[in-house]
Every structure is written in C-alpha cells, then in structure tokens.
C-alpha cells in the first residue's frame, strides 16, 4: 500500500479502485465493509455552481476517470468528450425510464423531470471536466504516497505508530 496514490476529492473511490488494479493482481483484491453503518453524504444538486454538491462530485469523478484512462494510454480530445457525453446522456435517459417503471410498479413517486434535469447537468459536466482535463494536464489531486512521505520524513511512520499506541493504552 506504500505506492497507492489516493485522490483527495470526490474521485476518491474510483481513484483507489484503479490504483488497486494497477498495483495488485485481480485475485488479490476484494471489497470489505469498514463500518457497521455508513452515513451517505447527501448533496444538493448545485446546478449553478460546479464547485459544490453533486455538480462538483460529477466533475471530480469524471476528471479522476479521465486521468486514470490517460495513464493507460487513452488519448482524449474535445471530440472524445462529446462522444462520451452523448453516450452517457443516451444511457442515462434509458435508465431514468427503467427507474420510473420500477418506481411505478412499487407505488413510489418518481419525478422524471427532476431526474432528467440532473442527467442534463451531469452530461454537461462531462464536457466541462474534459475541458479542465485538457487545459490542466498537470493537475494532481492525489495526496503523496506513503513511500514519498516516508522518504521526506523517515521518522513519521514511527511517530504515527507511537501516537496510536499511546491513544490505545
């Protein structure tokens, strides 16, 4: 785990997953629950501010995916991002219909208009995240690896261990 690069934004999960696939064989990877309960952070949509809420979340996750795919040799362009947007948009609208039907069968209320507005926002965010990705190729949202931290301060891991031992005694 010393070489895992961990994003510090909403790309955390996809970033860690792709790092695990990069560093370990598939048969060495599994998902585990680290808590009995998990509090999901419900976010506002934030249509008018891409730096907040679900809008920021979709931007960060999109950029994380683009960065990881680029490290595997995928080449991106404005045209590629337009194709990704179109593909996402069509599939997402299909899913809205599936969820609407499922909700109706279960007697639940489902606001198609609101869901499709979110699909439109998220589709546009793919384009915006793509622009940022192309304009800022050196953007790095990752915290340093433990190997780098240890190299910068060889005593830090020992200090962490001592602090944990002290807390637990």
For each feature predicted by the language model, list its residue ranges.
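Terminal low-complexity segments of carbohydrate-biosynthetic enzymes
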Residues: 38-39, 43-169
């Amino acid at each position: 785990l010393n070489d895992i690069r961990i994003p510090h934004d909403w790309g955390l999960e996809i970033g860690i997953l792709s790092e695990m696939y990069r560093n370990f064989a598939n048969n060495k990877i599994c998902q585990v629950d680290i808590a009995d309960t998990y509090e999901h952070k419900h976010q506002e949509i934030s249509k008018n501010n891409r730096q907040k809420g679900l809008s920021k979340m979709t931007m960060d996750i999109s950029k994380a995916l683009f960065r990881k795919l680029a490290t595997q040799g995928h080449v991106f362009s404005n045209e590629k991002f337009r194709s990704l947007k179109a593909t996402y948009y069509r599939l997402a609208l299909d899913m809205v219909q599936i969820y609407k039907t499922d909700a109706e069968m279960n007697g639940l209320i489902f606001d198609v208009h609101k869901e499709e507005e979110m699909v439109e926002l998220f589709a546009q965010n793919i384009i915006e995240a793509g622009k940022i990705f192309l304009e800022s190729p050196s953007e790095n949202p990752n915290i340093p690896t433990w190997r780098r931290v240890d190299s910068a301060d060889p005593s830090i891991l020992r200090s962490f261990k001592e602090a944990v031992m002290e807390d637990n005694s």
